[in-house]
A protein has these predicted regions:
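N-terminal cap/lid segment of alpha/beta-hydrolase-fold proteins
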Residues: 29-74
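C-terminal catalytic histidine-bearing segment of alpha/beta-hydrolase fold enzymes
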Residues: 67, 239, 243-291
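Short amphipathic alpha-helix adjacent to the substrate-entry channel of hydrolases
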Residues: 87-103
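Alpha/beta-hydrolase active-site loop
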Residues: 111-132
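Alpha/beta-hydrolase fold nucleophile elbow
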Residues: 131-143
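Glycine-rich nucleophile elbow surrounding the catalytic serine of serine-hydrolase chemistry
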Residues: 141-151
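Hydrolase active-site cap/lid region
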Residues: 151-205
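The feature captures the conserved acid-bearing segment of alpha/beta-hydrolase catalytic domains
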Residues: 185-247, 251
Length: 291
């Protein structure tokens, strides 16, 4: 073979390799699959999320968001965030830097109800089966996001690597209901959100006060699978009082033998959420895949 032909073959190989690598880019795959799911490229938007590609699409009337790392980590692990996308995102950014995807499926106004769980079921199928993400996402729930995180996890304990709940609602009677076990709760509550919550669950107020299917009622499966839970608790929280929410999660989960890590901040109210230095949470999430 002449030197000219050898050079031509070498150049062709380089071009083909580059084209193949371009086609395998995680960003390109996510973009294409979201367009398919949404049914039209008009339903897709792309933007920058702290230096990473972020794609959002409306799928059957529901907003999906997927932030994509430059190079996915082995097994394509992912953080599944509930509510308040982009708020106090230090942890999310650190996980993206480590090759994790960060995903979101909007369940606003559903307060972790069965309709919210079913919506998350559909997103999980998309993320795991279509995008090929890990079968066990790491769940992240701030404030009212704790309701969907814990209710979905309780239903599917084998499909969860670990859980991070941040000043999180564990009982909708406490927030937004401002009631607790047939008595006035210690939090502020929200009349408008309480009405919306009752509608989402299809309950009267009397039925809601007797409801026994919240996150605190179904921890056994998670404990049996030893799913690790990281709790951030601002002890002066008068919106989502720890005594009616996070404290009960910690005590009940420990009684069941479940592994739980507490991070307490004694002088803070419901805000701020998140950790300015999320290194301890990052280590916790990374370890959750190795158990």
């Amino acid at each position: 073979m002449s030197a000219v032909w050898k050079l031509a073959f070498a150049l062709a190989f380089i071009v083909a390799s580059a084209t193949s690598a371009l086609g395998d880019r995680p960003q390109k795959n996510v973009e294409q699959e979201l367009v398919k799911a949404a049914g039209s490229r008009d339903n897709l938007t792309s933007s920058d999320f702290h230096g990473f590609a972020l794609y959002a699409a409306e799928v059957d009337g529901v907003i999906y968001r997927v932030a994509v790392p430059e190079q996915p980590a082995a097994g394509k692990p992912w953080v599944w965030r509930a509510r308040f996308w982009g708020h106090q995102s230090e942890f999310d950014v650190q996980m993206l830097k480590r090759g994790w995807h960060v995903c979101y499926c909007d369940v606003g106004g559903l307060f972790g109800s069965d309709a919210a769980v079913e919506r998350w079921d559909r997103f999980y199928k998309f993320a795991h089966e279509t995008l090929g993400l890990h079968r066990q996402p790491f769940l992240e729930g701030m404030s009212r996001g704790g309701l969907i995180v814990m209710r979905w996890a309780a239903r599917y304990p084998l499909q969860v690597s670990g859980i991070y709940v941040d000043n999180a609602v564990m009982d909708f009677r406490s927030w937004p209901g401002a009631t607790y076990e047939d008595r006035k709760g210690s939090g502020k509550g929200s009349a408008a959100s309480w009405k919306q919550c009752l509608e989402a669950y299809g309950l009267t107020e009397a039925e809601a006060l007797r409801f026994q299917h919240g996150p605190l009622n179904h921890l056994e499966g998670l404990a049996e699978q030893r799913v690790p839970i990281f709790t951030l608790i601002n002890e002066a929280d008068d919106v989502v009082p720890p005594a009616e929410n996070s404290d009960l999660l910690v005590s009940r989960y420990r009684e069941l033998g479940g592994p739980v890590t507490e991070r307490r901040r004694p002088d803070l109210g419901h805000h701020p959420h998140g950790l300015a230095d999320p290194s301890s949470l990052v280590r916790f999430a990374l370890a959750s895949l190795e158990r």
